[in-house]
């Protein structure tokens, strides 16, 4: 695992993203959907106390049963800046991943990978630092454009930045808003979408994200006292 160092300011943070982006691996397909383990990571904030709590929940990819889970909390030490949110979240997320008693397998972030102004969102950043295959599944398209996919589960359209496809708008339930899938590290876009569909058997959001969201919110309530 590569050591994370907090940048001193926004300019240094952008320089870190630009430097690490060259280490993103895009020519691996990633593990097959429905095999091994998948891990959801998410964070929750107490802004009044500058507190962040991260959760990591490992599921069996075939059954979606919980295998292991962990949490970590810490102080928020980087300001809220669009495009630099990873620097607020990664220290706690890394700590939560390190506390897991099992290998996490594929990691699913509630956020972006290549679908980022510098092509280096949280999913890519986390992948480069850990060496794990990571995908991003977000609830909104950030600043990118897309056409509405067809109404059926599995329908998708490209998420575009100019002429470049940076992800996909993917329908995970019939007649429900799409989610926005992008590659983080050591996965392909087709495979990332297949994993997302395998993890959304009854809801719009992946089960990994739903579980991690619930756990970090519960842990935040306990940490905030």
Name these PLM-found stretches.
Residues 2-27, 90, 139-140, 148-225:
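C-terminal binding/interaction regions
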Residues 36-45:
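Two-metal-ion RNase H-like nuclease active-site motif
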Residues 94-126, 130-132:
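Catalytic-site beta-strand/loop segments enriched in glycine and acidic/polar residues
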Residues 133-138:
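Short hydrophobic alpha-helical runs that function as membrane-insertion/retention elements
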Residues 47-103:
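A glycine-rich, hydrophobic loop/mini-helix early in the fold
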Residues 79-84, 109-117, 176-183:
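Flexible, glycine/proline-enriched loop segments at strand-loop-helix junctions
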Residues 48, 115-118, 142-146:
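Short, well-ordered, mixed-charge alpha-helical segments that flank or form enzyme active sites
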Residues 27-34, 48-49, 100-102, 128, ...:
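Solvent-exposed alpha-helices and their adjacent loops that cap or buttress functional pockets
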């Amino acid at each position: 695992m590569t050591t994370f160092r907090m940048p001193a300011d926004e300019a240094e943070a952008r320089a870190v993203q630009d430097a690490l982006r060259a280490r993103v691996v895009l020519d691996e397909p990633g593990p097959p959907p429905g095999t091994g383990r998948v891990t959801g990571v998410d964070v929750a904030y107490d802004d009044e106390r500058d507190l962040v709590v991260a959760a990591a929940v490992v599921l069996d990819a075939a059954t979606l049963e919980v295998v292991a889970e962990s949490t970590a909390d810490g102080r928020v030490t980087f300001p809220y800046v669009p495009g630099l949110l990873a620097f607020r979240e990664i220290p706690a997320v890394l700590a939560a991943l390190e506390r897991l008693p099992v290998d996490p397998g594929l990691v699913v972030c509630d956020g972006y990978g290549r679908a980022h102004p510098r092509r280096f969102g949280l999913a890519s950043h986390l992948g480069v630092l850990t060496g794990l295959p990571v995908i991003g599944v977000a609830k909104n398209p950030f600043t990118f454009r897309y056409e509405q996919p067809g109404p059926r589960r599995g329908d998708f359209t490209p998420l575009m930045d100019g002429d470049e496809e940076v992800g996909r708008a993917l329908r995970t339930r019939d007649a429900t808003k799409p989610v926005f899938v992008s590659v983080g590290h050591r996965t392909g876009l087709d495979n990332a979408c297949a994993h997302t569909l395998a993890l959304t058997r009854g809801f719009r959001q992946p089960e990994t994200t739903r579980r991690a969201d619930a756990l970090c919110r519960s842990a935040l309530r306990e940490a905030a006292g």
